[in-house]
Amino acid sequence: MAELKLGYKASAEQFAPRELVELAVLAEAAGMDSATVSDHFQPWRHEGGHAPFSLAWMTAVGERTQRLVLGTSVLTPTFRYNPAVIAQAFATMGCLYPGRVFLGVGTGEALNEIATGYIGQWPEFKERFARLRESVKLMRELWLGDRVDFDGEYYKLRGASIYDVPEGGIPVYIAAGGPVVAKYAGRAGDGFICTSGKGEELYKDKLIPAVREGAEAAGRNAEDIDRMIEIKISYDPDPELALENTRFWAPLSLTPEQKHSIDDPIEMEKAADALPIEQVAKRWIVASDPDEAVEKVGQYVTWGLNHLVFHAPGHDQRRFLDLFKKDLEPRLRKLG
């Protein structure tokens, strides 16, 4: 069985840069093994939203912590970024913080790419997925430290080299919401990323089997693939506060089509605020009893996930981290 790891999701859409760094430092003190950050150019919400640059945050946190593994969850290396530049950035961080950096990638959302200059109709999944696969291949070639000529359908390199690369390159974690990309994660990823709250069948019968299938097809051991899940959890001894804290993150309860196609945070906020709190809370483990919270989290471990990254929705993250250290962390460690 893969090693159980506990992580903290730094909510870049909710907190300003300095606060987000301090929260990661506190997360290490609370016993977290990792800290991940999203890479949004625009937040899910216009009012009260934030969108600090993920790579600057990772470097700042790297300087302030000793053991936290840091990564994106997730970054899209295919539209507003050139994947060669992302490869260079992560190689530099890998040299600065050896063994503590990974690159989590996904196929992208219009919210972040249209505003930054993508021209034309937002691509369908087929093209976005093809771009992702090509970008990962390109970055891995650059991390070998050799001169690279790359002639892809979307990206090209001519005599390109990254001069400072960490030994072994950078682990790539691939985010998937369905079996097609999950199979690719098993075939080509060092890790796999998904999010909680979507029903047992998705994880137990689709995603994890697809990761294993992809690994087996590539002649790999599926147990070597870190299986990460963002656990949406609103835990507080005050049950009313635990429920109300989910409100800020109402956009997560929109349909996948809305989340991938709406390109304006103002419109995203309008659509999300039209949802009743009961629907918003369905995506979350809402609990005021620590045993109940850990029992619900434990289901994901039995379904095959081993790296649990906790995303708490409330504005008082210090309170959550204190409660995590006192109430949840000792119980969670027993799941391993």
From Swiss-Prot:
Active-site residues (renumbered): H40 (proton donor), E109 (proton acceptor)
Main EC class the enzyme belongs to: oxidoreductase
GO molecular function, a single term: oxidoreductase activity, acting on paired donors, with incorporation or reduction of molecular oxygen
Keywords: Carbohydrate metabolism, Oxidoreductase
Binding site for coenzyme F420-(gamma-Glu)n: D39, T76, T107, G108, N112, G177, G178, V180, V181
Function: Catalyzes the coenzyme F420-dependent oxidation of glucose 6-phosphate (G6P) to 6-phosphogluconolactone. Appears to have a role in resistance to oxidative stress, via its consumption of G6P that serves as a source of reducing power to combat oxidative stress in mycobacteria.
Protein name in the entry: F420-dependent glucose-6-phosphate dehydrogenase
Organism per entry: Mycolicibacterium fortuitum
